[in-house]
């Protein structure tokens, strides 16, 4: 099968790329998405704040993705969901992919656009020392469990990192009944927007520990001590939490 443009990834960037390619005159366009629905990370971002610049209205993540998906219906862009790309042959402009329905496929594209998003840094990637108990989640994992799967990740939660996603998830955990004991930030300032600091931390009485980082995680079960320390000072503080969210 031959296409003018093959887009790998059906998240916000992939959807926008396919629509723009169509506007620029490409007639045979294919989107490959490994998930079972389009939208990517937007589907688990149920907070508002999207669409102000592009659509001139405030939308949630799923609503924002839905706008692009509706726009796709006015084009001839093809979509293959639940499809995994196995290999890209650069010399022959060929993609090897497979799914349950069509099986193995060789797809040829004059142009191949990669819109696969990014990977979160895990605990190992940011070198947090200590034991390995259950209850340590990355931002995306915690957000998906709560917003899509409907599972609470814990009752007593500590957030590492004060970017906007960390602040938003801290608020989300509080709304779901968890006790968020604090948000720990290595820098002497928060990396999130001021409005999110006010709406997500201050309004819910969640403390923000600036110039702090996690020095140690102890134990082999949930509900074990987590030590934080002020940078450049010997001021060790122990926070007994059962869940740690990493938002770096």
Identify the residue ranges that each predicted region occupies.
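Active-site anion-binding loops
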Residues: 223-248
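Short glycine-enriched, charge-decorated loop/helix-capping segments at active-site entrances
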Residues: 50-58, 126-133, 223
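A Rossmann-like FAD-binding core segment of flavoenzymes
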Residues: 72-99, 174-222, 226
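Conserved acidic residues
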Residues: 4, 110, 181, 242-245
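Beta1-alpha1 glycine-rich phosphate/pyrophosphate-binding loop at the start
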Residues: 3-67, 71, 153-199
């Amino acid at each position: 099968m031959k296409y003018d443009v093959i887009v790998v990834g059906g998240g916000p960037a992939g959807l926008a790329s396919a629509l723009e390619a169509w506007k620029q005159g490409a007639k045979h366009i294919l989107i490959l998405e490994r998930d079972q629905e389009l939208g990517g990370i937007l589907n688990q971002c149920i907070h508002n704040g999207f669409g102000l610049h592009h659509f001139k209205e405030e939308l949630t993540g799923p609503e924002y993705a839905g706008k692009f998906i509706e726009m796709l219906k006015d084009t001839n862009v093809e979509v293959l969901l639940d499809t995994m790309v196995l290999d890209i042959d650069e010399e022959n402009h060929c993609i090897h992919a497979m799914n349950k329905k069509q099986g193995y496929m060789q797809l040829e594209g004059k142009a191949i656009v990669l819109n696969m998003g990014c990977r979160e840094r895990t605990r190992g990637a940011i070198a947090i020392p200590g034991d390995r108990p259950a209850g340590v989640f990355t931002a995306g994992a915690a957000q998906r469990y709560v917003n899509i799967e409907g599972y609470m990740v814990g009752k007593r939660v500590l957030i590492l990192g004060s970017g906007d996603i960390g602040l938003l998830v801290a608020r989300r955990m509080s709304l779901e009944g968890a006790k968020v004991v604090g948000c720990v930030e290595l820098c002497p300032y928060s990396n999130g927007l001021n409005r999110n600091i006010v709406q997500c931390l201050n309004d819910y009485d969640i403390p923000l520990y600036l110039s702090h980082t996690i020095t140690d995680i102890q134990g082999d079960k949930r509900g074990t001590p987590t030590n934080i320390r002020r940078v450049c000072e010997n001021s060790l503080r122990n926070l007994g939490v059962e869940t740690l969210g990493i938002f770096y």
